[in-house]
Amino acid sequence: MITTRTARQCGQADYGWLQARYTFSFGHYFDPKLLGYASLRVLNQEVLAPGAAFQPRTYPKVDILNVILDGEAEYRDSEGNHVQASAGEALLLSTQPGVSYSEHNLSKDKPLTRMQLWLDACPQRENPLIQKLALNMGKQQLIASPEGAMGSLQLRQQVWLHHIVLDKGESANFQLHGPRAYLQSIHGKFHALTHHEEKAALTCGDGAFIRDEANITLVADSPLRALLIDLPV
């Protein structure tokens, strides 16, 4: 079963220095029916104004994945670690109790645009605090997984995350690990097909809940960039 969640249905925020779209309840936006999906707690697309920053804050024990779409960001923690990431890169922060984290748009004249996901982390697992990965913009890529398969970022949860780039008319099929997945369009138009012959059309910024499907096929109706989050847990 596929249930779409259009970009217009998502929560919105505009603070001047920050513009955001929230898939699930976050900040001032609250919907008791949308507190996350399986281990996916947050899926935001945010634009930080030139020079803007998120001040240091602590997090619950989650893995925070930032996919940089445009611009360059710097991340720092209270332990003295810092790293920069730019467009075409994904950065994973394995947050720790009592450690605060900040984010800063390094450019003085260009906005920073990125997707941010929070995934519940298994309390027994300890991974590298910061991991970074270059995205392959020419094909499908597994960018995060429980064991760091195929050079992907290593998560503290049973989740597989795919970065998908397709030209118009191309298709891609994915075998899912369990009963749940979430599909997020970054840009482009496409349709998703299930083995039950169910079809859903998505466009830029739309998402879709996938339930009780063994596999999913994406067919690009225009040049496409998307994320598929395989969420058995």
Swiss-Prot record:
Taxonomy, superkingdom: Bacteria
Chief localisation class: cytoplasm
Disulfide bonds: none
Gene3D superfamilies per the UniProt record, alphabetical: Jelly Rolls (2.60.120.10)
One Pfam family from the record: Pirin_C_2
Keywords: Cytoplasm
The keyword Cytoplasm is assigned to this record: yes
UniProt subcellular location: Cytoplasm
Annotated signal sequence range: none
Family recorded in the similarity comment: Belongs to the pirin family.
Known function: Does not have quercetin 2,3-dioxygenase activity.
Other known facts: Contains Cys residues that are easily oxidized.
Name of this chain's protein: Pirin-like protein YhaK
Organism: Escherichia coli (strain K12)
Gene from which the chain derives: yhaK
